[in-house]
């Protein structure tokens, strides 16, 4: 019995420590993975805590301390759930304030409510869609490809071009494909691109690759079923930076909107406010991408900052960012939000107080559900024909 009580108490302590990751930014790269689990799969931890609380209630040893830690852990694990309901409650009003009355109630939308606890469990399933890989650009020593998911709807349809994350130096077009499948099922063509990576290829190589991918999709529109008048760019982290920079500098009228998941927007500010080195050596990442520090190649940093290219004609923008992101500071999205507001650009910043980097890893988690709800309406709005 003593051994069983000790094991139970140690498990409760471990859960208590894990629960703190739902409240505070992750302290290291390795705990970041745990933070994703805690914040985007909270129902698992809530169930465990409830079971341990019941077990502890009937135990004779360590009852007081164990019960207190169980209660605190339950509250912490519940934070993403409560936060999602809170954000979702006001989301319709904020979205329509940004993009117009009625834009949340367009016909044919799949997810009718921003968030539901039961959807975290009932939404789990296999929704894969087949893709075809096409080569879209060739440079010396590198052949670039894109994965094309055909819209699950007949006729010419808008195309969403996706840029993966990976600090500009890693990753590929198959990163987190759930959003590709989801959007294709909603009737959009999806092209997830591979682009040239640092440190071998430096800025603005990925922007050039995005332009080449769009050109390829336009020239093969008939066979792919792409409506070339309607492109939306979507990217995560480094990919978020790439799609913002592309949408703001290519000046292509066919790009109707841009969706940025936690992408850096002001590279000088980002360099001068580096991440916790236990999480990521962000200055080294930027030096590899730009070819030096912000003082060594200042023009590269200026030219690589999407915030510097905002005008009144800037593409409508949707930003989604976790406020507990330890990889890309949430302040960077706040800064772009302010600049877009000053220039009266239609935009929305969806801030998620509990969320960390890659928060949409599970589209059924609190962050994933809110992201789906918002993206679906944003894309439908900017591609209305």
Question: Positions of the model-derived regions?
Answer:
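N-terminal cap/lid segment of alpha/beta-hydrolase-fold proteins
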Residues: 20-49, 106-154
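Hydrolase active-site cap/lid region
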Residues: 97-113, 244-296
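Primarily recognizes the serine-hydrolase "nucleophile elbow" in alpha/beta-hydrolase
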Residues: 25, 212-275
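Short beta-strand/loop motif that positions the catalytic acidic residue
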Residues: 313, 319-321, 325
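Short amphipathic alpha-helix adjacent to the substrate-entry channel of hydrolases
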Residues: 174-192
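Acidic catalytic loop of the alpha/beta-hydrolase fold
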Residues: 267, 324-328
